[in-house]
Amino acid sequence: MFYQENFDVIVIGGGHAGTEAALAAARTGQKTLLLTHNIDTLGQMSCNPAIGGIGKGHLVKEVDALGGLMAEAIDHSGIQFRTLNASKGPAVRATRAQADRALYKTYVRSVLENQPNLTLFQQAVDDLIIENDKVIGAVTQMGLKFRAKSVVLTAGTFLGGQIHIGMENFSGGRAGDPSSITLAQRLRDRPFRIDRLKTGTPPRIDARSVDFSNLEAQPGDNPTPVFSFLGNRQQHPQQVNCFITHTNEKTHDVIRKNLDRSPMYAGVIEGIGPRYCPSIEDKVMRFADKDSHQIFIEPEGLTTHELYPNGISTSLPFDVQLQIVRSMKGFENAHIVRPGYAIEYDFFDPRDLKATYETKFIEGLFFAGQINGTTGYEEAAAQGLMAGLNASLFSQGKEGWSPRRDEAYMGVLIDDLSTLGTKEPYRMFTSRAEYRLSLREDNADLRLTEQGRELGLVDDIRWSRFNEKVENIEKERQRLKDIWINPTSENIDQVNSILKTPIVREASGEDLLRRPEVTYSSLMTIEKFGPASDDQQASEQVEIQTKYAGYIQRQRDEIEKSLRHENTKLPFDLEYNKVKGLSNEVVAKLSDAKPESIGIASRISGITPAAISILLVHLKKHGLLKKGK
């Protein structure tokens, strides 16, 4: 039976990728359906109760700059906020917040339920309706069929999900939820390259059984940083401390003695786990020279006693988990509320995706989130927003869009995935971006909001505030350029008091701000250069843009040089074996990857600059040299 209404976009899955995808499609005016196996778990934090971090916080700010939800949701549910790398340069500073799980999920659901153009429906999806290699809908568990022009699949760890606790294992998408077995089987019948990955979660602890007097308190920042460009500190709920403890030699001895009971070390789990978030048994074996590992004790919320011990993810049996937990300082009498576990699941080789997240084999089908081999809420949200946007554009018959590597971490993410693929769960770091000085948290809106407005993602409120901020930046920079001081000026002693070396020639406010020892706030203490701008975001930009102007310009020059042929299109049906001069290896790799552009081709492993030159000559010779947008 077909549902009586047709949709423009169907999103399958209500996690962090699915919610952003559904909201993006709906915000751009498309009639959108979000199918989830359980409406009560929309926006649920399946693993750690936190948003942001190095590289990840940058993605959250970019999602926000394009009108996404994640930053707004954490501002309303964050119970501890911190700026990481605060003493370092702006390129690597990152915001991180602990979340109250219940508040976060409630906020996400409220936004989804009140979003125009968006319909929610609770049913697991068992199959996709595909005709002539084009998706036209989805089939639910009870046989109900939904038609749509495009479909976004955000299945998380649910496709063929298998949960492991010791030698016991059972089917599940996460603890308490069923896995998508039928859909996983159907997708395996398609021409996708599919493999297995694994992730894990630690046991949850009852705070009432912990001796906090033996733990090191870790307070948040004061004043608290804000995630959303439209957010403010008044939105933040009550703030609390996190705590720190450590594993010890006793902990490690327990783990070593029970490795034969670990499904990972016994060969039961074949999927590869996240390199940068390994299980405690993996850490103990890989870093055998370390006597202890730091464990962050994170509260799960304001109205629960559950604690999340970040750093002891494990799939060891429950009795061993209990020994591990109770071996740590402060946890001698700890009670485990929920056991830790590992989960193994299907993922699809992201090299089978276009830069828009559309699959190369099935027209109108988009993948986002852990299905693409990534790990983390933030990576999922970024993919979800882009996939939802491009599914919307596809349903309207418009050309897709994705940012380049030099424009956004979102661009780095899809470029890495679609050109290099991944053999392990991929997480974002600032080190993955070659142009990170230009890709800062603080300028995500300046990089993306204008484009978001053109694409229909940015509403009037955000657009108005953005334009106000841009205007305030320009006005304040010009004001500082116009104020001059010289060695004989009336305020010279006051000026020299904030300088390492006194002024010997005439200088503008901008000249002074360029000096490493001068901050915007210290400059504003001098009467001649005050008062400070009322717009704190604008004044932050004035300082960063002024201090780093030379470096930023140098990076822009590098970007322009590298972009010369970045968007030169490569025909999908180009027969590389007929391009004279290409080696057999290059022909095989290009034929397999079918890159969309010269830029993407150049980043495929083994594709040499000489091969790129040969391709360009071939394109020109046959009248195929076309520049993309």
Curated annotation (Swiss-Prot):
What Pfam family is a match, any one?
A: GIDA
Described function: NAD-binding protein involved in the addition of a carboxymethylaminomethyl (cmnm) group at the wobble position (U34) of certain tRNAs, forming tRNA-cmnm(5)s(2)U34.
Q: Which family does it belong to?
A: Belongs to the MnmG family.
According to the record's subunit comment, the protein's assembly and interactions are: Homodimer. Heterotetramer of two MnmE and two MnmG subunits.
Q: Which GO terms describe its molecular function?
A: flavin adenine dinucleotide binding
The compartments listed are: Cytoplasm
Q: Which PROSITE patterns would you find in this protein's record?
A: GIDA_1, GIDA_2
Q: Which residues bind FAD?
A: G13, G14, G15, H16, A17, G18, V125, S180, Q370
The name this protein carries in UniProt is tRNA uridine 5-carboxymethylaminomethyl modification enzyme MnmG
Record's keyword annotation contains Cytoplasm: yes
Q: Where does this protein chiefly localize?
A: cytoplasm
Q: Which cofactor does it need?
A: FAD
Q: Which residues bind NAD(+)?
A: 273-287
| Biological processes, Gene Ontology terms | tRNA methylation; tRNA wobble uridine modification
One cellular component term from this protein's GO annotations in UniProt: cytosol
Task: Identify the keywords attached in UniProt to this record, alphabetized.
Answer: Cytoplasm, FAD, Flavoprotein, NAD, tRNA processing
PANTHER family reported in the protein's UniProt record: GLUCOSE INHIBITED DIVISION PROTEIN A, PROTEIN MTO1 HOMOLOG, MITOCHONDRIAL
